């Protein structure tokens, strides 16, 4: 297993831009190794929701921090964005903050793309995955600094060059919820991203073996891939608060089909708020005892995931960071 890293998920759907930057600065002060941000044009819920622009956030946090790694988890470089422009943006940030910037990518959700003008039926997974692979190929070509004539099925460049590129380009982390994309992440990604709370068999029997298989086919060691998981955790010494804090994130407990097909935050919110708190909390590690919390986190480490990014659902993120630094971080680092 690679070196253990502990990261913080900056929830752009829950906090405005200034507060979200301040929270990330706090995360570095509390010893976190990374901070990743979601990239939403629209939030999961209408009331109380936010959606600051992820790239502006990354640039602002980079200017106010010195050490913490920064990235998206995740951005879709294939619909409302042109991948060539995303390549330029991340190259610039990579020059500004050398060795600290990563690009986490995924296949996309209708919630963010339909509102910005995508026309027609939301594409099936096969097309979304094909677009992602093509976008990754194009971005990597542009990060060489060479002139790129690219004539793909979805994207095209003519004599395109990015003039300011960090040495080695920008690490790409590929998000996967199933073995097909996980295999691709093992073959082509610098990192792999998944999310917790979906049954350990998914990670032990499907995702991690697929990452290893993809790496082997590419002649790579799986240890060369940063294996990141967003751990949904509601930890608080007050057990009632730990449970209640999950309510804001009820949309995560909708079915995958609902999350990928609903295009309106108002509709998403209505569907999510109809769920009972017990169902909402199932996606989360809800704990008030630190040893019990770590006991539920440890299986992900045992499965081979080395970069744990913690997503806390409560509105008081400073409280979570204080408790995490005091109660959980020492126990987790002792495991490694």
Curated annotation (Swiss-Prot):
One of the record's GO molecular function terms: oxidoreductase activity, acting on paired donors, with incorporation or reduction of molecular oxygen
Catalysed reaction, written as an equation: oxidized coenzyme F420-(gamma-L-Glu)(n) + D-glucose 6-phosphate + H(+) = 6-phospho-D-glucono-1,5-lactone + reduced coenzyme F420-(gamma-L-Glu)(n)
E.C. number: 1.1.98.2
Record-linked SUPFAM superfamilies: Bacterial luciferase-like
Keyword entries, A-Z: Carbohydrate metabolism, Oxidoreductase
Signal peptide (residue range): none
Binding site residues for coenzyme F420-(gamma-Glu)n: 39, 76, 107-108, 112, 177-178, 180-181
Sites where the protein binds substrate: 195, 198, 259, 283
Active-site feature positions: 40 (proton donor), 109 (proton acceptor)
One Pfam family hit: Bac_luciferase
Subunit structure: Homodimer.
Entry-linked HAMAP family: F420_G6P_DH (MF_02123)
Its biological purpose: Catalyzes the coenzyme F420-dependent oxidation of glucose 6-phosphate (G6P) to 6-phosphogluconolactone.
Protein family membership: Belongs to the F420-dependent glucose-6-phosphate dehydrogenase family.
Name listed for the protein in its UniProt record: F420-dependent glucose-6-phosphate dehydrogenase
Originating organism: Nocardia farcinica (strain IFM 10152)
